């Protein structure tokens, strides 16, 4: 029988010359790119976060590398990162055999919640410098992401305001029943004076002082009256505390209509992920991102669930980050408003932003309604419309409306002359009297300009790209990287967490594009800087629709 032979197996053998730990890491592994990217970032702002005295802290570059690489691998828990620092060779190499515990890792994340945003900006500028992106075009979209707050911790503005009004009425009724002199002195019976907790505290103090100086008596009726007044004072103290609670709710709400008690920065919104199919609202944030070539180039959190009011602040965020505005803005119909169109026109942004019913107009079988105001003939010189029966609809005035952002819109009002007995009245309108239409001429002009851009060759290309730009990023974020819910409480910490995710996402996307261009391009030796190694890829990636060539011309 032949003798079996096995390879030597001595797990506790001592090695005379220990091998380098990164010898077992592939040359094209993304962990090397993370190491090179962070090594070439400017982290001088991190130094102010540490004290010169005390125990030496872990190096911020090491901590940053470990966290970013963990986020690239869908690991967002500090406890899991702590375990990987003892088990995974990639994390051990990045950390240089250091073993920070989960508390230290979490403290570092919270410590750099302001500076990590600057790190994200640096990375985007590196991508722009190496030709991955141009920063001349921004594809904008938003998604609602649930907060860590509990579901049923809501505070509604309407409920608070209604209960506060009821409470004020109870307070006024109670004040009418207590000491009349104090009531008149504090003008509490004057309904024009707004009662405040501090005013009620003064009234309570004066009432207590009066009751303390009441002479002792054996009369039962006087004792009963005294007990009743003390009871009213205690009741007034309870009302004061409740009024203070309502005022605190209104202060936290600000301009919002709701917030969560366990995460005051979160607002209740309707999410796409509705398991009960009942439209239940959940606490969350409206995350707006700007992408180019499927890289995240900007992001911001908003408390309002609609996208219309987020576009202008989001452009301001881009300008603050890069000291410029994008040359082209691409977004869906949720951003198409008069205020947004006007802002982009005044700031030189070429707007490829859809408006309501744009898709309906592009259908082959679409037939415009001949009775709709936009289908009526308009004489711009004499400022009147012509109805389907040929009557002139003369202008009768202007209606002004204020949007939630404070923007004033103007709509011209036109009225027909003789609608009684018109054979088309049943199809035209069903109200009594002569028909009145309201037309926003400025918005219609912006829509015509947007339509011309969107149906052009460049507009069709941007519309096609928009579906695979932010939508693809959201898909990869939620389903491939399992980032479906925020894991922190408070807008500042949520913003910090997503900044780490955005950095990891961009590095991961860069690795994917390098692999797609050629496997040999991802060979990063320890002495090669990220700039040199990216330069080999520069020129092969298609920048955003030849924007760089257009700038050069």
What kind of feature is each model-predicted range?
Residues 26-68, 441:
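Basic, short loop/linker segments at the boundary and entry of helix-turn-helix/winged-helix-like folds
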Residues 8, 67, 74-87, 98-553:
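Anion-binding and metal-coordination hotspots
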Residues 3-5, 50-54, 458-461:
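A ubiquitous short alpha-helical element
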Residues 1-32:
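Hydrophobic alpha-helical membrane-insertion signals
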